[in-house]
């Protein structure tokens, strides 16, 4: 019980440290990624206005036919979807916010999928 709580607290502290250095602007918004056990969520945020510009997740209707929503292939699809939505709104450069997680596995898959679809980091 305590280990799980400590791990969550450590991730939150890491995220605060990362967020001190990252700031999304209108020219280069922040691509924030959140990972739960079953799903993965990504959103492009303009921090100066405090507005979410684009959002995508494994719960999105465009990704309805996925076999599993908590694996690397689903995360890559979310990355591709968020990139397509961002490019449609005229956003082609972002700052990647890993959300206190290690840049590995599903977090890295979102970034790779977004890069492959044309988003620049």
Swiss-Prot record:
Pfam families: Ribosomal_L18p. GO terms for molecular function: 5S rRNA binding; structural constituent of ribosome. The keyword rRNA-binding applies. It comes from the Bacteria. GO terms for cellular component: cytosolic large ribosomal subunit. Keywords: Ribonucleoprotein, Ribosomal protein, RNA-binding, rRNA-binding. InterPro entries: Ribosomal_uL18_bac-type (IPR004389), Ribosomal_uL18_bac/euk (IPR005484). Disulfide bonds: none annotated. HAMAP family: Ribosomal_uL18_B. Belongs to the universal ribosomal protein uL18 family. NCBIfam families: L18_bact. This is Large ribosomal subunit protein uL18.
């Amino acid at each position: 019980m305590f280990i799980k709580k400590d791990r969550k607290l450590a991730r939150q502290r890491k995220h605060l440290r990362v967020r001190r250095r990252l700031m999304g602007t209108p020219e280069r918004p922040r691509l924030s990624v959140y990972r739960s056990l079953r799903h993965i969520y990504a959103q492009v945020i303009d921090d100066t206005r405090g507005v979410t510009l684009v959002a995508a997740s494994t719960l999105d209707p465009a990704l309805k036919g996925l076999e599993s929503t908590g694996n690397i292939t689903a995360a890559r699809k979310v990355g591709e979807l968020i990139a397509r939505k961002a490019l449609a709104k005229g956003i082609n450069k972002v700052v990647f916010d890993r959300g206190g997680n290690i840049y590995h596995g599903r977090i890295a898959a979102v970034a790779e999928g977004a890069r492959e679809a044309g988003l620049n980091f």
